[in-house]
Each structure stands twice: as C-alpha cells, then as structure tokens.
C-alpha cells in the first residue's frame, strides 16, 4: 500500500473488529476460533482500501490542461478511451460516492475534493453530465455547497 501508518491503523481496527465478531457471533456447536485468527480478516479489510498506485498523478496538470481534462471527462462519460488511471477511477467512482470515500487514501480524498470543487466551480456543465451518471441524487454537490456556505459564514 505504501502507507505504513494506514496499514497499522487498519490492522488495529481489524483486530478489534475480529475479536468483537468472534466473541459476539460464535455459532453454537462450533469451536471458538483461536485468538490468532484475525489475520485473514485483517487482509480482507486492508484489501478494501482503493489501490494507491495512481495517488501521485498530477491533478493540477490535468485540471489546467483542457485536452487532458476533456479526455478524463470523456472516459468517465463512456464516450472516449481511458488511460489506466482514468479506467481505475471510473471503476471505483460509483463505490467511492456511495460510501462517501471511506475506502479512499488521504491523497485520494484530497484529490476527489479538489477535482469536485474545480468541476462544480469552473465547469458546471461537465459536472452536471457526470453527476447524472455517478450521483443522480446530487448528494455530493449538496454536501459541497453546504460546506462552502458554512466556510463563507465563518469569520
């Protein structure tokens, strides 16, 4: 994964969850699993985080170069070819929106917010087209607008 702190935190959470699950949900008649068995569960939980291999993509370069940005948008709309990182984004985007980016790395969360702010503020037509595909309820836009109005209210 590349983020030892993240793995360590997931490992601690996984261990607690695994211990709670084995304590609370023991099936009658089956032996209680040994205390050393949370390892497979920890691996499954770590696997749930999105791959970080594209975390170092230069978002500013993409957002500031019309041709690059349009290529990404076309990929996400399904009207153009996808680079490997855009393809991965297209695959995980529905889940990331549905789960409020809970599986995102810190860089991915920051990048998602940055790109979303840019599209909503600077390219509303593109945002509306993508929103119809990935967030028809407008949930993310509503959250962003609420956050933006709160930030404007604060001194």
Curated annotation (Swiss-Prot):
Tissue expression remark: Antenna. In the third antennal segment. Expressed in sencilla coeloconica.
Sorted UniProt keywords: Secreted, Signal
First-listed, main subcellular location of the protein, grouped into a coarse class: secreted
Coiled coil ranges: none
InterPro entries per record: A10/PebIII, OS_D_A10/PebIII_sf
Gene3D superfamilies: Insect odorant-binding protein A10/Ejaculatory bulb-specific protein 3
GO cellular component, as recorded: extracellular region
Highest taxon above the source species: Eukaryota
Signal sequence extent: 1-29
Subcellular locations according to the entry: Secreted
Family: Belongs to the insect A10/OS-D protein family.
Protein name per its UniProtKB record: Putative odorant-binding protein A10
Gene field: a10
């Amino acid at each position: 994964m590349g983020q030892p702190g993240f793995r360590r935190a997931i490992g601690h959470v996984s261990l607690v969850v695994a211990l709670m699950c084995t304590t609370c949900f023991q099936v009658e008649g089956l032996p209680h699993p040994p205390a050393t068995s949370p390892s497979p569960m920890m691996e499954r939980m770590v696997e749930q985080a999105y791959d970080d291999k594209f975390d170092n993509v230069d978002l500013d370069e993409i957002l500031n170069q019309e041709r690059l940005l349009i290529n990404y948008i076309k990929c996400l709309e399904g009207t153009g070819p996808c680079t490997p990182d855009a393809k991965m984004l297209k695959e995980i985007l529905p889940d990331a929106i549905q789960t409020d980016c809970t599986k995102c790395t810190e860089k991915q969360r920051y990048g998602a917010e940055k790109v979303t702010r840019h599209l909503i503020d600077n390219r509303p037509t593109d945002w509306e087209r993508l929103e119809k595909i990935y967030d028809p309820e407008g949930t993310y836009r509503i959250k962003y607008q609420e956050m933006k109005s709160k930030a404007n209210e604060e001194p």
